[in-house]
Amino acid sequence: MTHLSKMPTGYTPPAEWKYPIDLSIDYRKPENRMYLLKAWVEALSYTEEHNQQVRLMDYAIEVTEGITQLEKIERKIWMAFLWGCCYNGIGPWTIYSEFPVPPQSPQEFKRFCDWYNLNFERMRFDTDCRYRKSKMIPCVQSYIDWLAGRTQMDAFRPLLETKLQSDQFVKLWDTAMGWKYFGRLSAWNFLEALNMVFGNMYQIDVPGFMLRDRDGSESNRNGAAFLSNRDDWVTKHGKKKINGCPITDEECDILEADLEQAFKDCVAEFGHITFINRLNFETSGACWLKKFFRLKNTRYIGWDAERTWDEIDYMERIWPEYSCKALWEARSLWLPDTLLCEKAPAGHVPGVQKWKMPVFFETGVPLHIWHLQQGTRWEPSEVYTNLKMPVRKIDDNPKSTSVNLMSLLKR
């Protein structure tokens, strides 16, 4: 059977990791951050966690029997749209399970409206997309109006087959931004998913990281700031946390250039393992890296696997009418057993492990990457026992004269 997307064949680690973690090194230090990024991206390239739940739902469509390739394509595009709307596994999978293609006829759209209103309370959207939950019906209506009776492939084909990649992106971006209640995040996530479900066939990508967008690009810009050892350029609502001054275009351009170079380096080193473009590198290489440098809501190898377990468990309990069998199957094929909650020893509490979140920030050691490289499961009792150094709290570090994380926090 020919598949449009990359299909999982079972997790296989490299014979030798290119960026092994040394437990005696503090990877918070500016001189070690680029190495940390590459170790992180290398790990994600093998677990494919940077493609999040989309890869699981896409797998479910690929293995669906009894439908044609064109029918699969229609389902894939619809799933990408739903991912842009919801940005989690629960919303897209439950809607898709009831409506595997857009509800374009008046009768089907009415059924969608009735179904959505009936199930509104148990529907879940990602926190960043929570306001769209109450606007989902007009959002879908806007998408259907744009389709104007066409199949999705017929509607997107002239945009996808644009000769110049820069023109292709502008057309796709302007189209997505034209749908009701779609903004930068939803348009970005939609295009990232659209490229993935086509197996990178159309090489959809953004020409740059848009770091001059003061609010819309704040998360990835702050990741670029940490990577560039410019922690004094970390902002909130476009203003530097250190002094309240707006970040300038010139400063944004410096960070853009640094992030672009890091992106190109990672493509050169890991692009043969998985496709890496700016659309997915923004999340994995910048936004998630930024979250290393805080105590709560951080990211780590296995975080996506754990939160996905939480979401599938929620659906099986709260939406029992829809099967999640294909999602469980995809997980087992993408991930090593050491990252699967369902393969954990007896007594393990599944789901997101919040005790993991502050470890890197407090010690400078990415134990999550180290454990993946060792092929071992990270257990709560092993938070510090594997370290060849004393636990180094932030306050134990001498004050640095460089502009780095520790000096910024002390200020």
From Swiss-Prot:
The keyword Transferase applies. The active site is at E282. Signal peptide: none annotated. Pfam families: ADDT. One of its GO terms (biological process) is symbiont-mediated suppression of host innate immune response. The keyword Transferase applies. Disulfide bonds: none annotated. One of its GO terms (molecular function) is transferase activity. Transfers serine to 5-phosphomethyl-2'-deoxyuridine (5-PmdU) to produce 5-O-serinylthymidine (O-SerT) as a step in the pathway leading to thymidine hypermodifications in the viral genome. As a final result of the pathway of hypermodification, 5-aminoethoxy-2'-deoxymethyluridine (5-NeOmdU) substitutes for about 40% of the thymidines in the viral DNA. These modifications probably prevent degradation of viral genome by the host restriction-modification antiviral defense system. Belongs to the thymidine aminotransferase family. This is Serinyltransferase. It comes from Salmonella phage ViI.
